[in-house]
From Swiss-Prot:
One of the early assembly proteins it binds 23S rRNA. One of the proteins that surrounds the polypeptide exit tunnel on the outside of the ribosome. Forms the main docking site for trigger factor binding to the ribosome. GO terms for molecular function: rRNA binding; structural constituent of ribosome. The keyword Cell cycle does not apply. NCBIfam families: PRK05738.1-1 (NF004358), PRK05738.1-3 (NF004359), PRK05738.2-4 (NF004363). The keyword Nucleus does not apply. SUPFAM superfamilies: Ribosomal proteins S24e, L23 and L15e. This is Large ribosomal subunit protein uL23. The lineage of its organism: Bacteria, Pseudomonadati, Pseudomonadota, Gammaproteobacteria, Alteromonadales. It comes from Shewanella pealeana (strain ATCC 700345 / ANG-SQ1). Signal peptide: none annotated.
Amino acid sequence: MISEERLLKVILAPHISEKSTVNAEKNNTVVFRVAIDATKAEVKAAVAQLFEVEVDSVRTLVNKGKTKRTGARVGRRSDWKKAYVTLAEGADIDFVGGAE
């Protein structure tokens, strides 16, 4: 079992984009920014416990940070990890929280 403290550190934020919105509508898949060292099992457990939904599958990828210039200096943005979480039929996560 994963500790409560670790579960809260795994999911950083929902990743809202045009692609993630289409995925949510068509495939019942939500996208999260997660900790770079998080495993698929940790992401699955965190989503299941924090949002009280059943998770079918988790797919992860690491986005490499871009090289950026500020004047003469060259820097690099941090790498970050994204997780596509497919929910079970009938499960839903509402990030907007609008009144029903």
